[in-house]
Amino acid sequence: MAISNAEAVVGRHCRLLRPVRDHEGRTRFSEKPKVLREVNNLERRMLLVQFDDGATTFLFPDEVVVEN
């Protein structure tokens, strides 16, 4: 993902590149979650995303493709 500022990705939907688990332990893959915020944790860039049912999880930028 080659987007440099947080405002460019916040509020946009993304496509998952591999199955991921949300905070409730459910496996997600075919959904397109919305990016809520971008955070840096221990020098790692992460995206907090929210699925249609309200569940959230943190993902690394290489796990998603942010859509226009």
Spans of model-derived segments:
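Basic/aromatic-rich interaction segments and small domains that mediate binding to polyanionic partners
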Residues: 2-4, 10-68
